Amino acid sequence: MAFLPCVGFCDYDVMRKVGSCVGCPLSRRYATSLGYKMSIQGIVSSTWSDILQLQQGVYLSVEPESLEVLQSKWLRSPETCFVFNEDSQVMGYLLAHSWNTEIPPKLFKPLPSNTEGSILFLHDLAVRKSESGKGIGKKLIAQLLKTAHLQGYEQILLVAVQNSVNFWKKQGFIPLNQKVNECYGEGAQLMRRVLVA
């Protein structure tokens, strides 16, 4: 697979927030002058070792998934899977794939066949602990929303784990009154964000 310098939907690399919004040319210029090179890119084969390492460091109450399982999401829908890079280091990643039911896929198993549908299932969002609070997760979600709108998805579903419900509420997701498989861990919550056409 060819290296993707950008997933094609942004008109600028995502730069560090320096005194203003990330879209401010002065902020981007200043960040560049400090030597920061940040971008959201599509996942490529060489990215996976960094993703696995990052996953091990952030999932404490849910067992990390295998490479085969994670790659099954990516191979099914590579255009909705991203990494956030800073100076060529993976600081965060997001995996999402097409889905056709409000019952979430089971963890630890590759995706079944025939999952195409109008739902985009956000399987995983992880950011290095050292980068917490810098807005990386929000930037990855913003990129996913752009892509989802362009591809015509009607909604995004996810299962909030590790007490992350409040974070997801701030991103526009609402809890659903539906139990999820116990493999997602204690307190896991199914959530939805409806996409406006």
Report the location of each language-model feature.
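A short beta-loop-alpha structural element at the N-terminal edge
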Residues: 38-51
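Conserved acyl-donor/pantetheine-binding loop and adjacent beta-alpha core of acyl/acetyltransferases
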Residues: 90-126, 132, 179-187
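Conserved acetyl-CoA-binding loop-helix of GNAT-fold acetyltransferases
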Residues: 127, 133-146
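N-terminal, intrinsically disordered charge-dense segments
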Residues: 22, 30-35
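Conserved GNAT acetyl-CoA-binding A-motif
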Residues: 141, 146-160
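Conserved catalytic-core motifs of GNAT/GCN5-like acyltransferases
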Residues: 98, 157-159, 169, 174-190
